[in-house]
Amino acid sequence: MLANVPRLKALMRKDGFDAVIATCAENVTYLSGFWAMSQWVRRGPQAYVLFPGEGHEPTIIVNSSLLDLVPDQNPWISDIRRYGYFQIDTDRSVQLDAADQLQHQLFSSKAYKNSVDALVGAMKERGIERGTVGIDEMGITPQCMDQLQAALPDIKFVRCFSLFERVRAIKTPREIEILRHAARVTEGAIDAALSIAKEGVTEREMLRRFNAHLVENDAAPVVGCIGFGNRSAMINVQPSDRKLKNGDLIRFDVGGRYRHYRSDMSRGAALGDPGEKIRKYYAAVEKGVLRGYDIIKPGLRVADLFKEIVATVQREGIPHFARSHVGHGIGVDGYDPPNIAASSVDVLEEDMVICVETPYYELGFAGLQVEDMVRVTKDGAESLMSLPTGLRIL
């Protein structure tokens, strides 16, 4: 189990919830360990996890067409309700292996008409027909929400996506292990991309090499911003046929997904000498991130972390440096809490995993960015990174 269930239960008690329902792709996967594929590839498909209070078993609600995913994923929740029609036949002349036996068992279970019918059935069996239920509002369609409220009129449904965010903010040891591996694979992809750096190589060719390394190491590409020269100042630069020239800066703002968990990091390199201004400005944004390591610890106000990082970059060489945020949490979603901004009311807690970043974009010049994945430890910070933060000269 990856989910921080003790934290979930504590927050449910605090918020007065008799049950909570996960509905969006990230929360369904996080809470159950089940990856409902259709949720991740298009909008609209419904999958839920019902998590009742003490004394009741949780339930996964999923479309019949996804039942074949259950044996390989082995979710920790054993009660799986299916809805919708899907035809699959069984060769009764052979002995089914364990995976096929489980599929046969699941396909032999009751098929509810739709996702809401399955959810309502599970709730009624557990006696959840009144009280207060938190529902993650980000994945359920308005039509399904209307049906759910009509079927259970005595329940007060309260939006609780923010509760799931608060739960996910504190990582379990297994989550931290996966995030560390995701970081290592992504760093390897940056190295792989830079291994082909020479005059004439295009941004697009570098991205292909980056993505290939991710895939070769069982990770999936998610973000691949790689820009050369003045194109590096494009905030969300998408690789083009721009060819690398001597003196060009190369900016990476990249990430992947490994076992459903995200990586997100930034590094800079240059083919030959990029010039004094780039060296000076890059050193400033690097020192901003390094200053974060000096002060990160449980209890630190996130707003204070923001202010100190910005002030460091300003002091170290970019006096006009300004940002809306200098990082964010990361986990099964690329932007878990906290958002490292001046307006944040959060404080750092042990076993948060955050991305600390100091991007600087100047059109006509360059984009400079350092971003590290960092775990908040009992008394400080632990980098999940192995690549040096300094500007790499090729």
PLM features: residue spans?
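Active-site neighborhoods and metal-handling regions in enzymes and metal-associated proteins
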Residues: 1-394
